[in-house]
């Protein structure tokens, strides 16, 4: 399934992530997944929420720079070898995984992963 990921630029200094997540709490936005890629001066927060459109509006109104990217959300059996099977299938289909991170779920026996790939349509066919 394709979902919308929000990428937000945060200053790389103490308290910035707490301030940002407090904003989401105040606006009753529930985070489902997050990942941070950092550089010396700023971080890129990749975020999945329960309402991406509301999130973008709230984030922009608060003065943050953000963008929206479609990514794949994939459910895997929560057992050894599930991820390697998926990655092997993508590799054999010549799909490059640009990054991935875990997704918080409430279903038993399943693990969810978010994938940014170079060809989402083809990846969906493979999966």
Label for each model-derived stretch:
Residues 1-127:
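A conserved regulatory-domain signal marking ACT and ACT-like small-molecule sensing domains
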């Amino acid at each position: 399934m394709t979902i919308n990921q929000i990428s937000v630029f945060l200053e790389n200094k103490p308290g910035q992530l707490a301030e940002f997540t407090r904003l989401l709490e105040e606006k009753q936005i529930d985070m489902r997944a997050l990942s941070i890629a950092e550089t010396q001066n700023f971080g890129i927060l990749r975020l999945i929420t329960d309402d991406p459109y509301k999130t973008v509006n709230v984030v922009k109104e608060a003065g943050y720079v953000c963008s929206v990217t479609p990514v794949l959300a994939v459910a895997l059996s929560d057992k050894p070898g599930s991820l390697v099977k998926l990655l092997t299938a993508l590799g054999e289909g010549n799909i490059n995984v640009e990054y991935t991170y875990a997704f918080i779920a409430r279903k038993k026996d399943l693990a969810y992963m978010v994938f940014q790939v170079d060809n989402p349509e083809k990846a969906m066919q493979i999966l």
